[in-house]
A protein has these predicted regions:
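Short beta-strand->loop
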Residues: 51-54, 76, 95-99, 120-125, ...
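Extracytoplasmic ligand-binding site segments that recognize negatively charged/polar headgroups
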Residues: 59-60, 102-106, 121-136, 169-188
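A short, structured surface patch at a secondary-structure boundary
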Residues: 28-89, 93-104, 194-198
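Flexible, glycine-rich surface segments
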Residues: 180-224
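Basic- and aromatic-lined ligand-binding clefts that recognize polyanionic substrates
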Residues: 25-44, 144-199, 263-273, 287
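Structured C-terminal subdomain patch of bacterial secreted/periplasmic proteins
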Residues: 27-28, 81, 125-142, 148, ...
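N-terminal hydrophobic or amphipathic helices and topogenic motifs
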Residues: 1-28, 34, 38-41, 90
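Solvent-exposed, polar/charged alpha-helical surfaces in well-ordered, non-transmembrane soluble domains
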Residues: 37-41, 84-88, 109, 131-135, ...
Length: 287
């Protein structure tokens, strides 16, 4: 078992590789975390990725940036994945979430006893974490220039977003509630956009919060398995909220301020942050 652990992402552990592959970039990558998948697809040729952490769903092409790129790639959440199937694809790099490391031998015995280099990643919790993660993955796949370009573009976009967000008067700060399906990156995006971000898992907490804006993820999961995704799913969720009479007094619902929005822990954070900023403070973008 050859592996590298990246804890807190900002602290790098040197990449460990066997003598046979130390000078060659990985060509057959298995990547489970979606945030890492988004970065990797932005750095390497699509054919270098042979397995991802979700199945392909055509309805999600507009909601997950890498969905169409992974159309011809095998994939499933780690809970439903088949180690032997994955190993039969002859991977030369496995990328997993760090929370899987403690029980790695028990949950993935075949991976554990293989010689495939494995990288464990903590989910990024800040913009700096995302930057460091992009640089790290760029080094591992031997695309440092592409990683630096990706970082510079993201920093430029985030600077523009912060410039607008910092102009928001305190008394105009909006409350945005993420309802239903959670996202570990919601708070990060909310902070960037200068909104009061709240997570409301159910209708009762939503009624108590009475947010100005409600956002829903455009997909639903069950234990990591993608159940549904896309515009029709989002539309059904919004209609269901709007038709619930007990919630009609909520500011966001009475004003029709309900939106489907994805949140990213990758270079795509700039895209979702800009969209949330325009939703929350449209007057700052009027011509």
């Amino acid at each position: 078992m050859i592996y590298c652990t990246v804890c807190s992402i900002c602290v790098f552990t040197p990449w460990i590789a066997s003598a046979d592959c130390s000078n060659a970039p990985p060509q057959r990558i298995v990547v489970f975390p979606l945030y890492a998948e988004e970065i990797i697809y932005g750095l390497v040729e699509p054919e270098r990725i042979i397995y991802v952490g979700h199945h392909y769903a055509e309805s999600g092409i507009d909601d997950w940036p890498t969905m169409i790129k992974s159309q011809q790639v095998a994939g499933e959440c780690w809970e439903n994945s088949d180690e032997e199937e994955i190993l039969s694809l002859n991977p030369d790099l496995l990328i997993l979430d760090s929370y899987l490391q403690d029980n790695f031998e028990e949950d993935f015995p075949a991976f554990f006893h293989s010689t495939v280099p494995t990288l464990f990643l903590d989910s990024p919790k800040s913009i700096d974490d995302i930057i460091h993660l992009i640089i790290l993955l760029g080094d591992i796949v031997q695309k440092p220039d592409a990683a630096l370009s990706m970082v510079n573009e993201m920093i430029s976009s985030m600077s523009s977003i912060r410039e607008v967000a910092n102009k928001i008067p305190t008394n105009e700060k909006k409350t945005v509630a993420l309802f239903g399906e959670p996202s570990i990156f919601f708070d990060l995006v909310a902070n960037v956009c200068n909104v009061n971000g709240l997570y409301c898992p159910d209708e009762q907490s939503l009624a108590v919060a009475n947010p100005d804006i409600i956002v829903l993820l455009p997909y639903c999961m069950d234990g990591g398995f993608l159940l549904d995704i896309g515009k029709e799913y989002s539309k059904d969720c919004i209609v269901q909220l709007e038709s619930e009479s007990s919630l009609s007094r909520i500011t966001a619902i009475s004003s029709g301020a309900i939106y489907a929005l994805n949140f990213h822990g990758s270079q795509y954070i700039a895209d979702c942050a800009m969209r949330l900023l325009k939703i929350a403070y449209p007057t700052f973008f009027s011509d």
